[in-house]
Amino acid sequence: MGARASVLSGGKLDAWEKIRLRPGGKKKYRLKHLVWASRELERFALNPGLLETSDGCKQIIGQLQPAIRTGSEELRSLFNTVATLYCVHERIEVKDTKEALEKMEEEQNKSKNKKAQQAAADAGNNSQVSQNYPIVQNLQGQMVHQAISPRTLNAWVKVIEEKAFSPEVIPMFSALSEGATPQDLNTMLNTVGGHQAAMQMLKETINEEAAEWDRLHPVHAGPIAPGQMREPRGSDIAGTTSTLQEQIAWMTSNPPIPVGEIYKRWIILGLNKIVRMYSPVSILDIRQGPKEPFRDYVDRFYKTLRAEQASQEVKGWMTETLLVQNANPDCKTILKALGPQATLEEMMTACQGVGGPSHKARVLAEAMSQATNSAAAVMMQRGNFKGPRKTIKCFNCGKEGHIAKNCRAPRRKGCWKCGKEGHQLKDCTERQANFLGKIWPSHKGRPGNFLQSRPEPTAPPAESFGFGEEITPSQKQEQKDKELYPSTALKSLFGNDPLLQ
């Protein structure tokens, strides 16, 4: 502890112990705070010996300050302690930690102003003119043009061959053509061998923009004053009716006319149309597959979004809405739980395992568990659920645990239902009756649940007065059946039988 507490001594230690932790608070800094700061610096892999000097404290502050906003409370406390110690080393009188932070911020602002003034002085003393490629100043002070390098042209051709006209071609063209003249831009376009249909579309866009420029910038009537340059027309900006010297003069005049930047904007506008033609997929059609990782889906989404010709506000709305809406059900459930304010990093972290083997196994297990539970519930509701099986019973001896086929007792004679001999169980007349209350088969006639007689359709009978009528055999059978089976007619079940009326 002695080595750690030896950071301050004498008057500095007295000044340290007079500073309050909080404005208006009672607690003040003590030696234990220096010991704690030394241990924290070791934990953050910083040298605790830096606390002994003001320069060392300044180095520690420079390391800790970028992480203050996202750091923990311990990191902020360490930063406040080192800032207060810096004021003690510099013999700046402060009353509390808040005042020490304000003093330190003032010192940092003064240091920044000094550096800015020094940089401005160095720039003023430097007599060399800035070299803005491809237009540079030679030793005689003249503005000359350096032709675009073959390496740049080779990089541009390689991008077109590999990427065709995908969305990343536009920023690549913008980077390679930085500060180029219209002649340089035409050289880059002429090196494109294939894709002549796209080049023709680009020429049409350039011609349209040149005509619009001529309409908005009409030529002034009268002769041009001596020493003045003519104003560029649309064809001059496109490099078809202007020389390289005129282009350099326009770009370096006071005030300058940036013909190269204007022509570059026209080309980028045409490239946007070509990219949209070569990327026919709409952002509305980008949907995550059921087994596609969320990272691959996000890559496809933003690649298609770059090709969309829309404002930044519209693209922001597409990102907030469609990215979640077009995700698969698993990821969509997770993303909706995160809320609308979730960052892309949080989304990708939350959906990192979706679609992998472990996630598939977990989803399959949950689905099988739900299916099993639902099937069991349906069986219980329908009454199909069978409880424990009933104990079998022997028909021969009447004991449980075996059937008559395996029974060791003497075989019982006669019917197993009524016990009488002369017939078997299947022919026993003491079995359960049918729904009309009669045993079937009967010895004669139709089954009990059928009509016992069926009238045959005949012509109407002749009038009879009952003299000498003969009773036919069929009528005798009908009367006999009525006496034997009085309850088998439909009248006994459903009221009056129309066939018997």
UniProtKB/Swiss-Prot annotation:
Residues the record marks as site: Cleavage: Y133, P134, L364, A365, M379, M380, N434, F435, F450, L451
PROSITE patterns, per the entry: ZF_CCHC
UniProt-annotated stretches for the region Interaction with membrane phosphatidylinositol 4,5-bisphosphate: 73-77
Cited InterPro entries: Gag_p24_C, Gag_p6, Lentvrl_matrix_N, Matrix_HIV/RSV_N, Primate_lentivir_Gag_pol-like, Retrov_capsid_C, Retrov_capsid_N, Retrovr_matrix
Interaction with host PPIA/CYPA and NUP153: region residues: 190-228
SUPFAM superfamilies hit by this protein: Retroviral matrix proteins, Retrovirus capsid dimerization domain-like, Retrovirus capsid protein, N-terminal core domain, Retrovirus zinc finger-like domains
UniProt region (Dimerization/Multimerization of capsid protein p24), positions on chain: 278-364
Region PPIA/CYPA-binding loop: start-end pairs: 218-226
Residues bearing the modification Phosphoserine: S149
Motif (PTAP/PSAP motif): 457-460
Entry domain remark: Late-budding domains (L domains) are short sequence motifs essential for viral particle budding. They recruit proteins of the host ESCRT machinery (Endosomal Sorting Complex Required for Transport) or ESCRT-associated proteins. p6-gag contains two L domains: a PTAP/PSAP motif, which interacts with the UEV domain of TSG101 and a LYPX(n)L motif which interacts with PDCD6IP/AIP1.
Protein name: Gag polyprotein
Organism field: Human immunodeficiency virus type 1 group M subtype D (isolate Z2/CDC-Z34) (HIV-1)
